Each structure stands twice: as C-alpha cells, then as structure tokens.
C-alpha cells in the first residue's frame, strides 16, 4: 500500500474479465455459430450493450484501489494488432483468433468510463500495452516503486529491484506477485 505507481494492462484485464464472466454455453461451444447463438445470455444493458467484461474490470479495479491504495494509477491499452512489430514481422501474433464481437464492443466503453472517472490511460496505435507499461516502469522506477498488473507472462522481463509484477491467473481473483528474487530463483 502507499506511495507507488500501479500500471494495469487494461486489455489483459478486460479480456480476462470478459471470458471469466461468460455463460458456460459459450465457453464450451466448439463452433463460432454455437457461441453466437448464446450471445443473448451475456450480461448487457437494456439497450443491448454488452457489459460483462466492463463489470468485472471495474469490480477488480475498485477492489485493487480500495485494498492497495496506489498513489498513482495508469491503465494501458492495445488499440490494434497492427503495431510496429507487425510492420517488422507480418506474422507477428498471426495465430491469434479474432476478438469476439461482444468483447470488442466493450473496449471503447470501458475506456470512456475510465476517462470519466479521471483515470490516466495510455494508448498508442503503434505500441502494445506492454510496451507502454514497460516504458512507464523504466521512466519512474528510479523515483518510486512500480507495480504492474497483467495476465501476460511477457511482462516478467520488466521485473527489477523496484518493479514488481502482479500476474493474474485465469481466475482474476487470484494473483501471483513476482519480485526480483522470485524471477532470479525461477531461472536457476
């Protein structure tokens, strides 16, 4: 708790909460048509706006703010898959499936909600959320401790004496905390 910067991979948290709050019928469906047949069961507003991911995202965010009380907070977003890495290597993340429409619709709305709450957001169409979090961590870790929340193991390379990683499980309620000593002992 206290005087530190908390960086959240918003794309990772929203996706985790979206999939964690889906009806079982969608999770276990094999074909896209079967999944789409159950979209009406996903949490949504009376106007048909999907909200299951946003609901989980905000619930988790409020819990972190209440329990951890970070002095500074920023949420980073992936805006597109066509970042500088795809320009360098056309097949970068080429094996990923398309983002489901009910999830895709929630990104802009979640960003709007956070903007209305006054939460700092980091986004750039040429960079991924992990690039933005990494840059912020490197910029500020000499001034104050940095903690990063994500589900992405790629962030482990950012762990230092002053940068800690909170790595979410599939169940976003469970979070591993990676510090430099854990990262060093794991590599031995």
Question: What spans do the regions from the language model cover?
Answer:
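Non-catalytic, usually N-terminal nucleic-acid engagement modules in DNA/RNA processing proteins
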Residues: 1-74, 84-87
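Structural beta-sheet core signal
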Residues: 6, 74-77, 148, 167
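Residues immediately flanking
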Residues: 10, 79, 153
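Short, glycine/charged-enriched secondary-structure capping and boundary segments
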Residues: 20-23, 89-91, 161-165
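Extended two-metal-dependent nuclease catalytic cores across DNA- and RNA-processing enzymes
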Residues: 30, 40-44, 94-188
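Generic hydrophobic, aliphatic-rich segments that mediate packing or membrane embedding
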Residues: 53, 57-60, 80, 85-88, ...
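Short beta-strand-loop/turn "lid" adjacent to the catalytic site in phosphate-handling enzymes
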Residues: 73-98
């Amino acid at each position: 708790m206290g005087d530190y910067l908390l960086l959240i991979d918003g794309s990772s948290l929203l996706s985790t909460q979206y999939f964690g709050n889906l009806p079982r019928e969608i999770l276990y469906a094999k074909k896209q048509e079967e999944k789409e047949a159950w979209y009406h069961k996903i949490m949504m507003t009376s106007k048909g706006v999907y909200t299951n991911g946003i609901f989980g995202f905000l619930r988790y965010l409020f819990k972190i703010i209440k329990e951890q009380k970070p002095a500074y907070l920023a949420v980073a977003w992936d805006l597109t898959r066509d970042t500088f890495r795809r320009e360098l290597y056309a097949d970068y993340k080429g094996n990923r499936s398309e983002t489901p429409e009910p999830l895709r619709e929630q990104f802009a709305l979640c960003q709007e909600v956070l903007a209305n709450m006054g939460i700092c957001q980091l986004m750039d169409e040429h960079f991924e959320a992990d690039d933005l979090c990494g840059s912020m961590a490197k910029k500020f870790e000499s001034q104050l401790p940095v903690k990063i929340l994500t589900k992405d193991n790629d962030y482990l390379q950012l762990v230092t004496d002053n940068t800690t990683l909170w790595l979410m499980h599939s169940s976003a309620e469970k979070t591993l905390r990676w510090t430099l000593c854990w990262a060093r002992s794991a590599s031995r």
